Swiss-Prot record:
Record family assignment: Belongs to the protein kinase superfamily. CMGC Ser/Thr protein kinase family. CDC2/CDKX subfamily.
Xref: PROSITE patterns: PROTEIN_KINASE_ATP (PS00107), PROTEIN_KINASE_DOM (PS50011), PROTEIN_KINASE_ST (PS00108)
Record-listed Phosphotyrosine modification sites: 116
Entry protein name: Cyclin-dependent kinase C-2 C
Compositionally skewed regions (Basic and acidic residues) per UniProt: 565-576
Principal EC category: transferase
Length: 644
């Protein structure tokens, strides 16, 4: 009895903070039992405290031993050949494995390209077996990037299913900064097969592919793995008809701790679920089911069914295909900005119209997978148990599937490029849609002056002494003769000029100016050209009125450097053909008398097409050209007199 009562008292004191009974209210025997019980409880508490101190010390020793064991594991992995940056950041990813040597494989051509990886076909040197080497892109100096890469390795090691790509090894070395993942080589992917115009799948073949895809996805979801990048190019097929799900670079393991902390920036845009497009960060396996529905429709139609260029356009295409959600959907959704994605117009679903050749059970399965509400898409297991796979014709055996030449996404892109090139060649031969070719940019580049051939119609100025005929065109500090200049020059020199033969009797030479990014062309001998290029105060004829239109300041002509535009290089020779210092509109009698020191070189403030309202442009051009010829002739005569 005493033991029972003592246990009861002890139990009460443990359960709550109830006060002790007062000794006056109890008998002597009861008071004695209470005191004994409390003395026993105190002794038990002291024993527990001593035991906890001993356990605390043992916990500390265990922590120290764990830390030392972790360092020992890193040392063992480094001795096995793993790089130090991988052992320190993600040792668990390669625990128990030994790295493969790069010399054991002969890398061949590239067969795939992704955002975070590149895939190559390779041959194992010892056995001659074909494998696929996936080079993962990451920064080995950033631990987070290393752990992101290692997550794919951990997930692949966790999964083991005939319809999932199996990781066979890792190629790296102690001094390497890269990693290659070794997989079985698969000859095809669904993107290449479905887009091939020579391949048309039958319904039993489609069911065979879809069942294998759902089997592999069911294995992932049962282990808490969401793929998050299911698309046709990531679904691989070998010549035996076996389908395998690959590329787990964006996959993640969903746990209660991270269920509401996922990112919405996953899945390729054409296969992305609407809740991800709306910015959801709390989702489950239903995002993979939506992608499976997109792949299902792509196999049926031979092309992606939802090809949006932006997220908003992708949502709009989803509304047009699956119909706009009901009002109840917007009320139940927990997304903060979901109402901003609500369409202004109600869309009716057009999926049945686009899948007329599909059976009723197939359309129902496709509508289920492409449901706007994630809860209505079901699971991979429910899709496998749908009537589509339980009705005739049944899925065929994978070994009975036909064998095709290698077809991958890169092959499909190559076929599309060749098809476009052939179409362009046909249009070019027929003359339809032919466009005039614009002059090559190299003609305007001042660096290519010496490399370009001289135009045949360039008029050389002869019988003029070398010093008088030298054009002081300043381009990056180089000087060129008149006969060495091409017909067009770039904007860096501040002007462009060329003398051309004209078929008209007057043989008027014109100067052509090309603005950096303007399609308009303006004669270099016009008054407006000289004024806007060199800042001269020139007055055109009263009948010739011109305007400057446009405010494009991106086409401003570069200012001629002062150290390169000194008039000492020209001297007092007014016959020099330096376009940066010659007043083309000066009168014939004033030309040999005036100096060029009063000219101010500045930057063009307004760039744009110049429109002349008068029709007397030819007279201005002829007079200016006459002034140039007279200046050259008088300079020649003046030089001859000086030589005498």
């Amino acid at each position: 009895m005493g033991c029972i009562s003592s246990k009861n008292v002890s139990c009460l004191t443990d359960q709550g903070d109830s006060p002790l009974p007062e000794p006056g209210l109890l008998s002597t025997s009861q008071q004695h039992r209470v005191l004994i019980d409390h003395s026993l409880e105190a002794s038990h508490n002291s024993k527990r405290s001593r035991k906890s101190r001993r356990l605390g010390g043992s916990d500390l020793r265990i922590g120290v031993s764990l830390g030392s064991s972790h360092r020992n594991i890193e040392a063992e992995q480094a001795a096995a050949g793993w790089p130090a940056w991988l052992c320190s950041a993600a040792a668990e990813a390669v625990h128990g494995w030994v790295p493969l040597k790069a010399e054991a494989f002969q890398k061949l051509e590239k067969i795939g390209q992704g955002t975070y990886s590149s895939v190559f076909r390779a041959r194992e040197v010892e056995t001659g077996k074909m494998v696929a080497l996936k080079k993962v892109k990451f920064d080995n100096l950033q631990p987070e990037s290393i752990r992101f890469m290692a997550r794919e390795i951990l997930i692949l090691r966790k999964l083991n299913h005939p319809n999932i790509m199996k990781l066979e090894g890792i190629v790296t070395s102690r001094a390497s900064s890269s990693i290659y993942l070794v997989f079985e080589y698969m000859e095809h992917d669904l993107a290449g097969l479905s887009s091939n115009p020579d391949i048309r799948f039958t319904e039993p073949q489609i069911k065979c592919y879809m069942k294998q895809l759902l089997w592999g996805l069911e294995h992932c979801h049962m282990r808490g793995v969401i793929h998050r990048d299911i698309k046709a190019s990531n679904i691989l097929v070998n010549n035996k008809g076996v389908l395998k799900l690959g590329d787990f670079g964006l996959a993640n393991v969903v746990t209660p701790s991270n269920k509401n902390q996922l990112t919405s920036r996953v899945v390729t845009l054409w296969y992305r679920a609407p809740e991800l497009l709306m910015g959801s960060t709390s989702y489950g396996v239903s995002v993979d089911l939506w992608s499976v529905g997109c792949v299902f429709a792509e196999i049926l139609m031979g092309k992606p069914i939802l090809k949006g260029r932006t997220e908003i356009e992708q949502l709009h295409k989803i509304y047009k295909l699956c119909g706009s959600p009901q009002d109840s959907f917007w009320k139940r959704t927990k997304l903060p900005h979901a109402t901003s994605f609500k369409p202004q117009h109600t869309y009716e679903a057009t999926l049945r119209e686009r899948c007329k050749d599909l059976s009723a059970t197939g359309v129902y399965l496709l509508e289920t997978l492409l449901s706007m509400e994630p809860d209505k898409r079901g699971t991979a297991s429910s899709a496998l148990n749908s009537e589509y796979f339980l009705t005739r014709p049944y899925a065929c055996d994978p070994s009975s599937l036909p064998k095709y030449p290698p077809n991958k996404e890169m092959d499909a892109k190559y076929r599309d490029d060749m098809r476009r090139k052939r179409a362009n060649l046909k249009l070019r031969d027929s003359g339809v849609g032919r466009k005039h070719k614009r002059p090559h940019r190299a003609e305007y580049d001042p660096k290519n002056y010496a490399k370009l051939p001289i135009r045949k119609d360039t008029l050389e100025v002869k019988n003029i002494p070398n010093e008088a005929s030298r054009a002081t065109t300043t381009t990056h500090g180089n000087y060129y003769k008149v006969s060495d200049l091409p017909m067009t020059t770039g904007p860096a020199s501040g002007f462009a000029w060329a003398v051309k033969r004209r078929k008209d009797p007057d043989n008027i030479s014109t100067l052509t100016y090309y603005q950096p990014s303007s399609k308009s062309q303006l004669s270099g001998t016009s008054v407006a050209f000289a004024k806007n290029t060199f800042g001269l105060n020139l007055k055109p004829d009263n009948d010739s009125v011109w305007e400057v239109q446009g405010n494009n300041y991106d086409d401003v002509i570069e200012e001629v450097p002062s150290h390169e535009s000194k008039l000492s290089r020209i001297g007092e020779r007014h016959g020099s053909l330096d376009g940066s210092g010659l007043d083309f509109s000066q009168r014939e009698e004033d030309s040999p008398k005036k100096t060029l020191e009063h000219l101010q070189f500045g930057k063009q403030s307004i760039s744009g097409p110049l429109i002349f309202k008068s029709g007397k442009i030819d007279e201005i051009l002829q007079r200016n050209e006459s002034n140039i010829r007279q200046a050259v002739r008088k300079s020649h005569l003046q030089r001859e007199q000086d030589d005498r």
